């Protein structure tokens, strides 16, 4: 595409389908990157067994995000900034340096004439949850939700946020109303077969749908 300057990048959470290209982008020193927004690089979350059949809220440990893709991203970011430190030319140093920023919930930044508000990261007190690949679900809870406002147009961007994420944002009193809602987790409904068999009729996303009052919802996969 020929893009050689990225003013900012937002990493919602450390999954392959959300940050998979970051290692390559950071390794391309011809691309200038001003800022990367994301969770604390050393954040810990409750994790259970890698064996899905053995995952249980009774057997969890606080663990750093340790997906291979996240480790590779952090290594690439460190390598990029090391090159910046070692560069002798001022312009080269500025073009290589990448600022990593952990946003504050409620913070608003300007994107030209648009504004983007961060609704995370929030307090790290998520409980270990329901029986649908609990480790993946747990990581998704840390998705950074944002709202972009441009004139009279508004867009709520949710990453792979879980119901618990949205509930916590609402409890903080943040305004999630928007014209357009990007459905969390590609529109995927994270309910168990047992719940469906017992007559569970509501999507996990009903909470954010109701809160956003959006007239348009975008589902990338479903």
Give the residues covered by each predicted segment.
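Alpha-helical scaffolding within the catalytic cores
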Residues: 20, 165-170, 196-207
């Amino acid at each position: 595409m020929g893009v050689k300057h990225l003013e900012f990048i937002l990493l919602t959470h450390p999954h392959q389908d959300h940050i998979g290209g970051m290692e390559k982008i950071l390794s391309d020193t011809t691309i200038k990157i001003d800022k990367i927004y994301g969770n604390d690089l050393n954040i810990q979350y409750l994790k259970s067994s890698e064996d899905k059949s053995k995952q249980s809220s009774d057997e969890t440990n606080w663990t750093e995000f340790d997906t291979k893709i996240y480790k590779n991203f952090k290594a690439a970011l460190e390598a990029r900034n090391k090159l910046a430190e070692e560069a002798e030319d001022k312009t080269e140093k500025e073009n290589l340096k990448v600022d990593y920023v952990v946003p504050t919930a409620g913070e608003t930044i300007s994107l030209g004439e648009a504004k983007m508000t961060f609704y995370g990261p929030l307090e790290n007190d998520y409980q270990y949850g329901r029986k649908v690949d609990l480790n993946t679900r747990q990581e998704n809870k840390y998705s950074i939700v944002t709202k972009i406002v441009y004139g009279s147009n508004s867009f709520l961007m949710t990453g792979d946020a879980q119901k618990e994420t949205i509930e916590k944002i609402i409890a903080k009193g943040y305004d999630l109303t928007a014209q357009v809602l990007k459905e969390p987790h590609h529109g995927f409904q994270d309910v168990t077969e047992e719940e469906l068999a017992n007559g569970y009729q509501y999507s996990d996303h009903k909470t954010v749908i109701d809160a956003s009052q959006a007239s348009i919802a975008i589902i990338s996969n479903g």
